[in-house]
Amino acid sequence: MGRDTIADIITSIRNADMGTKGMVRIASTNITENIVKILLREGFIENVRKHRESNKYFLVSTLRHRRNRKGTYRNILKRISRPGLRIYSNYQGIPRILGGMGVVILSTSRGIMTDREARLEGIGGEILCYIW
């Protein structure tokens, strides 16, 4: 039985978002690095740095904070395709979250990308998660 690293990322970010923590430490793999880069580019997290600790690499990401208020923005992250039930979609069937305000992260033959990038390139893939 393997680990679901994508679900681990989502759970870590969600737990840190609910609490008062502003930072999340995630084990670094190629998939996690690509997903965190997308989250950084889309503005869901503020900062990411790579940290080495006893021959293992971790990504330390800072969550985005509200101005003039305590706490972070409440982002909703939902895992869609999971190891027991894979969900695939062609580029025409990729769902739009909140009319395009949310982000769908896909795993395609050209790497991990957002729904907008996949529609522009005209490729579909496995729907990993929704973020809004």
UniProtKB/Swiss-Prot annotation:
Query: What name is this protein filed under?
Result: Small ribosomal subunit protein uS8c
Alphabetical list of PANTHER family matching this protein:
40S RIBOSOMAL PROTEIN S15A
Q: Is S-adenosyl-L-methionine a UniProt keyword of this protein?
A: no
Please name the PROSITE patterns in this protein's record.
RIBOSOMAL_S8 (PS00053)
Gene that specifies this protein:
rps8
Q: Which organism is it from?
A: Illicium oligandrum (Star anise)
Q: Which GO terms describe its molecular function?
A: rRNA binding; structural constituent of ribosome
Stated family: Belongs to the universal ribosomal protein uS8 family.
**BP-aspect Gene Ontology terms:** translation
Please list every transmembrane segment annotated in the UniProt record, as residue ranges.
none
Q: Which UniProt keywords apply?
A: Chloroplast, Plastid, Ribonucleoprotein, Ribosomal protein, RNA-binding, rRNA-binding
Its function? One of the primary rRNA binding proteins, it binds directly to 16S rRNA central domain where it helps coordinate assembly of the platform of the 30S subunit.
Give the InterPro entries listed for this entry. Ribosomal_uS8, Ribosomal_uS8_CS, Ribosomal_uS8_sf
* GO cellular component terms, A-Z: chloroplast; ribonucleoprotein complex; ribosome
One Pfam family matching this protein: Ribosomal_S8
Classification via NCBIfam families: PRK00136.1
Q: Does the keyword section mention Mitochondrion? A: no
Subunit record text = Part of the 30S ribosomal subunit.
Which HAMAP family does this one have?
Answer: Ribosomal_uS8_B
Compartments it resides in = Plastid, Chloroplast
